[in-house]
Amino acid sequence: MTLKIEKRAEKLGTTIKLIGQIHQDDLGGLKAELQQSEPTIVLDLEEIFLVDVDAIRFLVECEAQQVKINNCSLYIREWIQRERSR
């Protein structure tokens, strides 16, 4: 399975729901989606079940740029925290 992106504009910004897997090859398209979104961005990871290290580093960068990450699985959240502390 590849990455599916569902984008929803809302009053206070944009919610981008990600479904499937996030790999290095997906990051270019995902970055483009973020650049085309409203200033307040939420990434919904509820349906993400697999990521690679490049995806984790991307998510660390997103949080540093004030992108909110919702519905993140525990293993992804812990990996983000470990990567951030490096």
Across the structure, where does each feature detected by a protein language model lie?
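Short beta-strand/loop segment at the start of cytosolic alpha/beta domains
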Residues: 1-14
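Amphipathic alpha-helical interaction surfaces in cytosolic regulatory modules
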Residues: 18-86
